[in-house]
Regions:
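C-terminal helical cap(s) of enzyme catalytic domains, especially alpha/beta-barrels
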Residues: 77-91, 133, 145-170
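Small/polar glycine-rich anion-binding or flexible loop at a beta-alpha turn
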Residues: 123-127, 149, 180
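A short, charged, Gly/Pro-tolerant segment at domain boundaries
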Residues: 173-180
């Protein structure tokens, strides 16, 4: 699979990240699909008014899978130097603080498109991962947690297996999107 990150808040084109423009998302997805030999995952930006618009655009362009969310745009100010702490003034915020937003967006997108979703954003435990799955993610991705615990992903997977045993769930797909 090939994941295309169309949502980096640090790279701008004409003042707006092109991943925030549904027409641009559909067009770039179509172009990539014409050339790609493998399934295409489009990584969506959360920095939009309605993420379902860009999700539908990516699906219309032929995306095989959607991954969401990428980082939220944030800012840090160095109070001692009284200036921006980041070279671009703004940058991506990730980790546990964005999880409630990410779960909401996965839920919204899962109810708007038919393609599978990889949920991400603040997953540090099996409980976090299960929230994404119950909201509609077919798979999850663990990022920031791996920096402070290299075994985080293994712990998440083991915790999901334990949950499934405790709840007599044979196939994880039986949990995908069951919270309505």
């Amino acid at each position: 699979m090939l994941e295309i990150n169309i949502s980096c808040p640090n790279v701008k084109e004409g003042g707006i990240a092109f991943g925030q423009n549904p027409k641009a998302v559909e067009a770039i997805t179509k172009e990539i699909k014409k050339r790609a030999r493998q399934p295409v995952i489009m990584k969506l930006s959360p920095n939009v008014t309605d993420i379902t618009e860009t999700a539908r655009a990516a699906e219309a362009g032929g995306a095989d899978v959607l991954s969401l969310i990428n980082t939220l745009t944030g800012m840090k100010i160095d109070i001692h130097r009284q200036t921006f702490a980041l070279a671009n003034k703004t940058g991506g915020v990730s980790g546990p603080a964005i999880k409630p937003i990410a779960v909401r967006m996965v839920y919204q997108v899962a109810n708007a498109v038919k393609v599978p979703i990889i949920g991400m954003g603040g997953i540090t435990s099996a409980e976090d991962a299960l929230e994404f799955i119950l909201a509609g993610a077919s798979a999850v991705s663990v990022g920031t947690a791996n920096f402070y615990d290299p075994a985080a992903t293994i712990k998440v997977a083991e915790g999901i297996e334990k949950y499934m045993e405790q709840h007599n769930v044979e196939n994880i797909s039986d949990l995908v999107g069951i919270v309505k």
